Amino acid sequence: MSSKVRSLCEAAALVKDGDHLGLSGFAVARNAIAFSHELIRQGRRDLTISQAIVGMDADILVGAGCVKHLVYGGGSLDRFGLVEHINRAYEQKRIVAESYSSLAVCFRYLAGALGVPFMPIKSLLGSDILKRLYEIAPDSVREMDC
């Protein structure tokens, strides 16, 4: 069996412009900083980033102009402040930002891991988050009767 181990450069080279990446971490903990820097160095563009709590890695990718679409459940740089690049890019309409709750993003990951198209949750019902998602990404959310 061949090894799955890759150098950082080789791993980043597998990512193509327009790909959708799921990042882990939380604010400033366990972020993929070196990987993000390598994506920037290799000049990736038009990426979609999903992250339950956006952190420094997503912020630097947005700041470098690599991200077109962000799917996230809030975030900050914890004691270091706000995610300035993300906030600025959103205000200037340089990125599309789908803001969910962190739980909703995690359930999206769970649905993908289970190989199902969606995972029903009730936590967004009656929230402003759901109202905004209907405006920004109407194909990403649905209400259903059970």
Q: What spans do the regions from the language model cover?
A:
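Conserved alpha/beta enzyme-core scaffold
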Residues: 1-146
